[in-house]
Amino acid sequence: MELKNIIFDLDGTLLSSNQIPLEQTVEFLKDLQKKGIRITFASGRSHILIRNTATFITPNLPVISSNGALVYDFASEKPVHIKPIDNKVIPAIMQMLLEFQETFYFYTDKKVFAFTHELDSAKILSTRSQIVGIDLIENNYIVNKFEKALDFDFKQHTITKILLVTKNREKVPFLAKQLDQIQDINYVSSMTFALDIMQKDVNKAYGLKVLVDNYNLDPEKTMVFGDADNDVEIFQSVKWPVALVNGTDLAKKNAKFITEYDNNHNGIYFFLKKFLAT
């Protein structure tokens, strides 16, 4: 068996609907690590918000966060690569965000800033994890009233990703068309009600290349698990792309394998157990 590395998306893949990995899967992955297989994560989440998962499974490699815009090493507690959104294009994005009055999040190299019309702080806290898969991390997650966005000095921050969230899923294609008018950005739908905005050419495969170039990761000896449209490029970059059965049609179309069970029923565990037995 030439499998040496496994990379996991988090939301909808390694994590159950309760936002934690299932125990049976965790124990199996720890056994694989003991056998020399390296494990890490590739997520749309900020590295700040990946940390909770790393308490269940310690990654052997830096994690690919913000859809590839920031690769972070938990061992050294330092970023090893950052590709931020160019400050020149942020005003155009800001204009769109303010015009359409949708909740949005600035992911930076140090914090996450949320801007929302939800004035009930308790409601904001409860929906952070349920809606956008965000862990409640004190001091690193700043919730602001929507109007505060006018005062946000983006030039003082290294912005790796902007997450746009709408309550109306049917509005996503319309919002995507507005983003098409802005040059030098890339966007993808990581959830049916959200759009992730990054610098042009940034995606999870971009983050993967950082590991290939700096950490002796061979794509021909690598498996990737994912479930969403933002996994397509990294699926196309490795030998064994695996989509969860609960994944999007586009993710499954670009996968070599599809799990029998979903993320709430140890889909990863059952797939790997069968795959490694052959």
UniProtKB/Swiss-Prot annotation:
Residues reported to bind phosphate: L10, S43, G44, K204, N230
Cross-referenced Gene3D superfamilies: 3.30.1240.10, HAD superfamily/HAD-like
Domain of life according to the entry: Bacteria
Matches recorded under Pfam families: Hydrolase_3
Any one GO MF annotation of this record: magnesium ion binding
SUPFAM superfamilies, per the entry: HAD-like
PROSITE patterns, sorted: COF_1, COF_2
Enzyme class label: hydrolase
Keywords of this entry: Hydrolase, Magnesium, Metal-binding
Gene Ontology CC terms: cytosol
Keyword Transcription regulation tagged: no
Active site: D9 (nucleophile)
Record keyword Ion transport present: no
Residues noted as binding Mg(2+) in the record, renumbered to the chain: D9, D11, D227
Cofactor: Mg(2+)
Entry-linked InterPro entries: Cof, HAD-like_sf, HAD-SF_hydro_IIB, HAD_sf
NCBIfam families membership: Cof-subfamily, HAD-SF-IIB
Record-stated family: Belongs to the HAD-like hydrolase superfamily. Cof family.
Descriptive protein name: Putative phosphatase MG265
